Amino acid sequence: YYDIKIIDALLAERYTGVKSDLILENFKALHEISLKKHPDFLLPRTPLIPGITDTDENLGAIAEFLSLLGVKKASLLEYNPLWHAKLNKLGKDELGAGKSRDWMDKKHVVHCKEIFSAAGISV
């Protein structure tokens, strides 16, 4: 598995602490290697985080990036609000303040999948 969260370098740095450039270059390199020996070995995944990674713009950019590389399959990981309980146990509940505590709407998940399908990528 290889997680691709955000394509935009500045947004990636804001939310993950690092720009996406190296992450994307590493994926390209690993994808090339996997194509030669094990074409189905490397599965790109994108966690769907409300308002951050699940936007049409971001998902469209990820789907386009993967499509240009010839990727035919990816995985979208639905948002799981149970992480709030972990923060509480760690004494870090303030990190989750204002964040969604609801499961993703199924219609929105279908919409996210359709963005990838439109780029020829099954999810």
Descriptions of predicted regions:
Residues 33, 41, 103-123:
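C-terminal accessory region of radical SAM enzymes
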Residues 64, 72, 87-115:
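A structural motif corresponding to the C-terminal lobe/cap of the Radical SAM core domain
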Residues 1-82, 88:
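Conserved AdoMet/S-adenosylmethionine-binding subsite of the radical SAM
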